[in-house]
Amino acid sequence: FLCFTFNLSQAQQAYQVHQDNVKPSMLMEYEKIAKEFNAASIEHNLQTSWFTAMSNDFRYYYITPIKNFAELDERPMADMAKAMGDTFGEMFDRFDKCYDSHGTYIIMKDDALSYMPEGKSDAPADENYRKWFYMYYAPENAKNMREGMMAVKAFFAAKGSTEYYRVYRNGFGQMEHYYMVSVSAKDEIDSATRGKVNEQVLGPDRWDVFSKIMKYATRMEEISGEMRPDLSYSPKTE
């Protein structure tokens, strides 16, 4: 608990993430219900907000920025549930048939490790395609992993790379330690093209720098996905 308190206080931004692991056979039904829920949220002007992302293996992420622990105790959907009556519960019963597992946890954005243009912290609005690189590590190697991540950032800057990325790390509700690097692009082709260009910019020395992370990683994952503005939500403002 003390470790989590420290991490949250040091983070640039914390996010509550709800993840639905949707069954392939239920993908279209899930999409239908998710759009109904989004429409209901707009109708009732639900007083919370989230960004939605989807991975290529049908994981859906609903990502809400939070400022502190107290926000986790809030019930922003209570008024909406009361107004909708049985329809609200029935909607979530339908959701539950679309996945065998789901859950909620916290991640933290780490601006100190992120590599972004001066004055920028978020991906461009027209870049919804994503590559997510997960690097897991044992707790005993936390210091070495962080130093490796800093070395990669410094290397990108020294080479003048324009392949920018944001870094997130695990938080409350997760069993494993990891860093997740999020790289945006306009689409899959744009991502591949920019990746090849970046390889040329960084040159063969990149492997010496990357090894400062790889030798401490217990495993690594690369996942493709996209942001879903059509399933994202924010309340109306006066």
Question: Can you say where each PLM-predicted feature lies in the sequence?
Answer:
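Short S/T/G/P-rich N-terminal loop/turn motif that feeds into the first structured element of a domain
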Residues: Q10-W207, S211-E238
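Bacterial Sec-dependent N-terminal signal peptides
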Residues: F1-Q13
